[in-house]
Amino acid sequence: MAKYVAAVDQGTTSTRCMIFDHAGRVVAVDQKEHTQIYPQPGWVEHDPLEIWTRTQEVIDGALRKSGVERSEIAAVGVTNQRETTVVWEKATGKPVYNAIVWQDTRTDQICNQLAQDGGQDRFRPKVGLPLATYFSGPKITWILDNVPGVREKAEQGEVLFGNIDTWLIWNMTGGVNGGVHITDVSNASRTMLMNLETLDWDDDILDVMRVPRAMLPKIMPSAAVYGAAVGALEGIPVAGDLGDQQAALFGQTCFSVGEAKNTYGTGCFMLLNTGLKPVPSQNGLLTTVGYKIGDQPTVYCLEGSIAITGALVQWLRDNLRFFDFSSHIEEYANAVEDSGGIYIVPAFSGLFAPYWKSNARGAIVGLTRYITKNHICRAALEATAYQTREVLDAMNKDSGVDLTALKVDGGMVFNNTLMQFQADILGVPVIRPTVSETTALGAAYAAGLAVGFWKEVEDLRANWGKDHEWSPQMDSATRERLYSGWKKAVTRTFDWVD
């Protein structure tokens, strides 16, 4: 009798496998980091083969730690860093180039050329997204144009494209020996190639971006049985696939219209459930697919994507050597009462929502001799909260409904200083659930629903519990004064790259 569901959570900096029981509790977790490759300023790559190796290692590790027998696992789900682009040879399984990561800005010129006819919102009515370096379509075009011989192979059906979900599921189900080449609607909605109404690849956009349809995966529901695993999970159904932010929405049980969550990881991503129709944004948000369970109707979302939040803490740790462990930032930040009047705008990959300015670059403004490392650490945490406020304001305008509380998850939600400042600068309560790693949980839920381990989404609501709630403690005058300073600081980053 199957008692558990497994999930592979492949993120920007690490891969983990988590095993959950029927109540959504974590039974075991194993996690490993992978190499970040920076060939040029603005370029970010990963080695797809390293990611596949790490995936196999963490599956083995989680099984070993849990003591769970393979026969006790009902299904395995996959969730992934979205938009990151892999192209590989069908016959050998060998990538033709490193994975181009979502943060990578090398496709700036491709996006600018595409925008010359119709502007940045040229494809938005069909795909819900602005032309930006963030999304997969231009990354595929770059690989086809810049890696010798690949375009010819693509046109002959000899190479395959996938985001990380597709790459992992293809390998997990056999790879060159019959691996399944699929993606789900949530990941496909981030390529800039899928029509939100038809839930199919859009031939007009494929023609404009010069992407052969033959290399694209089949688009499937987020909860469905795609194939059977090989290796450590031999014979287990691979049955759930969600982009990481949609998985977090699902794991937070935001199944009703108007429910929202914010995930704090490498970047920050706020998603609002808008129901069964795509809602166009007038305020710099993305219209995207939330999830699709089997043959049930598709659920759509508005999303505010912030490129750099946790990655700013990593930068202070790795590049400036401010501390040895990311968790230490809270201690330094708490050594001062405020940021000393400075703001850090971490536009390392340009600015995402609500600005969509790929030519912005990072800045620290307001520096004086008074400023110490502690002030910089505090300003780094505050930058995450300010960016979230900008997205929440946009979401309130688009939806016409003011959010009354924010569910949060991800690694940074254990930083109490950040969470309190977040509640202060939003003016609404911030709520952390008992299982904060909701991304993996969402993928597990999707896989479990596909095989009947859970019967329906309402069964999952009972698993959600509140761990902690932060209430606003800042007066409104201070809140607006600080936020006004942030808005001024952001303008200093615009148009930095010619």
Curated annotation (Swiss-Prot):
Q: What does this protein do?
A: Key enzyme in the regulation of glycerol uptake and metabolism. Catalyzes the phosphorylation of glycerol to yield sn-glycerol 3-phosphate.
User: What catalytic activity does the UniProt entry give for this protein?
Assistant: glycerol + ATP = sn-glycerol 3-phosphate + ADP + H(+)
Write out the GO MF terms.
ATP binding; glycerol kinase activity
One record GO biological process: glycerol-3-phosphate metabolic process
NCBIfam families in alphabetical order: glycerol_kin, PRK00047.1
Tell me the CDD domains matching this sequence.
ASKHA_NBD_FGGY_GK
Show the Pfam families listed in the entry. Answer: FGGY_C, FGGY_N
Annotated positions binding ADP: 12, 16, 266, 310, 411, 415
Write down what this protein is called.
Glycerol kinase
Q: Which UniProt keywords apply?
A: ATP-binding, Glycerol metabolism, Kinase, Nucleotide-binding, Transferase
Q: Which family does it belong to?
A: Belongs to the FGGY kinase family.
Where glycerol binds, per the record, is at: 82-83, 134, 244-245
Q: Does the keyword Nucleotide-binding apply?
A: yes
Where along this sequence does the record place binding of sn-glycerol 3-phosphate?
Answer: 12, 82-83, 134, 244
Q: Does the keyword Metal-binding apply?
A: no
This entry's Enzyme Commission designation comes to 2.7.1.30
